[in-house]
Design a protein with these regions (language model features):
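Positively charged, amphipathic and often flexible ligand-engagement surfaces
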Residues: 1-170
Length: 170
């Protein structure tokens, strides 16, 4: 799926006929990937990378989780904890998964695109989605790990970090 299409979806712009067809085709391809992964007993990790397409990707991931994360976890969403809203979103995702009867696949990472995100926010005139400092990122990352560990009955956790202290806490 084109990046520009994800941006249009994120901003709730109306899609034309060709864009709708492109979206449907991308959804079919993603579904095929998840289907084959489930048959081969492997996981699929999905990551938006940029905040300005994150909601679009989150929606697609939820569709796939609802379909494939019933018996076991196939699909994981990536939660970039350098964003100040991701701990709350993780908790909301857990509640959503519970309400819809699927297991949440959560890959936790700190994130690596701080400068890019801050620069874009400044250029576009919106508040930065990034934590104010590394300590805040570490705090939310560790809180997210703890939250997942406390809810393993309905969360499959992948801890993506090189941080020794976070590994020891997990």
């Amino acid at each position: 799926m084109r990046f520009g299409l994800l941006e249009r979806i994120q901003s709730a712009e109306a899609l034309n006929r060709e864009e709708l067809a492109e979206y449907r085709n991308a959804l079919k391809r993603l579904d095929a990937i998840c289907y084959h992964a489930s048959k081969k007993n492997v996981a699929v990790f999905i990551d938006a990378e940029e905040s300005w397409i994150q909601d679009s990707i989150d929606h697609l991931v939820w569709l796939m989780m609802k379909r494939y994360n019933k018996q076991r976890v196939v699909v994981y969403n990536t939660f970039q904890m350098y964003r100040h809203d991701r701990l709350q979103f993780l908790q909301e995702s857990y509640e959503f998964a519970n309400s819809k009867g699927f297991v949440l696949g959560a890959k936790l990472v700190r994130g690596a695109y701080m400068e890019k995100e801050r620069k874009r926010a400044e250029e576009k005139g919106y508040p930065s989605p990034i934590q104010p400092n590394k300590q805040a990122t570490d705090k939310d990352y560790d809180a997210a790990v703890l939250f997942c560990l406390q809810h393993l009955e309905n969360i499959a956790l992948f801890v993506g970090t090189h941080n020794e202290q976070s590994c020891m806490k997990a």
